[in-house]
Amino acid sequence: MSIRSWPAAERPRERLLELGAASLSDAELLAIFLRTGVAGKSAVDLARHLLNQFDGLRSLLDADQPAFTAQLGLGPAKFAQLQAVMEMARRHMAESLRRDSALENPAQVRNYLKAQLRHEPHEVFACLFLDNKHRVMTFEILFRGTINASYVHPRQVVKRALAHNAASLILCHNHPSGITTPSRSDIDLTKRLKEALKLVDVHVLDHVIVGDGEPLSMVEKGLM
């Protein structure tokens, strides 16, 4: 049955306009994004099928292009549309951070870093560079691969901090395993970077580790 034949109060788009996006299920939100279904399936039916295939919304949103476009009802145009929506969401968060001090809203900072790094299939190390009022200047990925004290070069981090004229920064990297517990190498690396950046009067405010669930703040865990 086509969604158009449903009572207005049950249609996802009408429900969103009346009740707000937060009131909709994952399937209803995805159905609005899909707009149309396929033969024998309404957009909501197709959305439920896709969520089942990917075992949830997160895996669907994180899927690469081959995995995404291999599914019924999806294609390159939908993949491009989804990537554009997600990038706009990341930029919206970045603009909010540029207006306020990162210290005043640490949860927002962690959510932004999670949005930047959660989808990365391999370990990456990045910095969030801040001005003298702790407002975000820019986010930059510096290293890809195994993140440890021998792979991440302090001189490169210092070089980028000086290039951005940053007064402080937040270190961050992801754990593709999903477990955010810092390793001994993570702790040692943080110490080395703090010492190197202190020499050029750039302060390390935190080191955030992104995995499944909430990102971990090494400051809040007393590890810095």
UniProtKB/Swiss-Prot annotation:
Residues 102-224 form the MPN domain. A motif (JAMM motif) lies at residues 173-186. Keywords: Hydrolase, Metal-binding, Metalloprotease, Protease, Zinc. GO terms for molecular function: metal ion binding; metallopeptidase activity. InterPro entries: MPN, RadC_JAB, RuvA_2-like, UPF0758, UPF0758_CS, UPF0758_N. Zn(2+) binds at H173, H175, D186. It comes from the Bacteria. Belongs to the UPF0758 family. This is UPF0758 protein PSPTO_0086. The lineage of its organism: Bacteria, Pseudomonadati, Pseudomonadota, Gammaproteobacteria, Pseudomonadales.
